[in-house]
Amino acid sequence: MSVAANRKLLLDVFRAIEQRDDRRFRELLRPDFELHWPPSLPYGGSKARTWSETWEPFQLGETERRMDPRVVAVSEDEGVVLWRQRGVSPSGERFEGELLGLYQIRDGKLARAQMFYFDTVAVASFLKKATSG
């Protein structure tokens, strides 16, 4: 696919996630799609919880679901996106952190995604406090 088409694909993926449009999200993925999160997080590695199960309780509003994706680089088969993750705990504590995602694209669909947090410790700390209350 072209660079422009891949840029659009990446932004469409983020739009589907922000809008919680699971059907559209699945349409944008290859059947063998792989997702890789840091193993130190509750949804990383081979842990049972998913990103959605972990974060959706803390992203009830549109503000928290907004990811502000910015395509940093894109080629014919991969892209890098800088995006923000937000959440609010039941006690009102707010979290906002930046990530870089490395995305592989094959046949016009997302094949692989790997996330790199700028501060994994802050994410883990927020989740621990937010779920222990």
Residue ranges of each PLM-predicted region?
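Short, cysteine-centered beta-strand-loop-beta hairpins and adjacent loop/turn segments enriched
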Residues: 60, 87-96
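Hydrophobic/basic alpha-helical segments enriched in Actinobacteria
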Residues: 6, 91, 104-106, 122
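A solvent-exposed, acidic/Ser-Thr-rich amphipathic alpha-helical stretch
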Residues: 23-77
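Low-complexity, intrinsically disordered terminal/linker segments enriched in charged
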Residues: 112-133
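Hydrophobic/aromatic beta-strand elements that line small-molecule binding cavities or substrate pockets
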Residues: 55, 66-73, 84-87, 98-104, ...
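Short, low-complexity N-terminal intrinsically disordered segments enriched in polar/charged residues
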Residues: 1-31, 129-133
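Hydrophobic pocket/interface hotspot
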Residues: 10-13, 24-26, 33, 50-51, ...
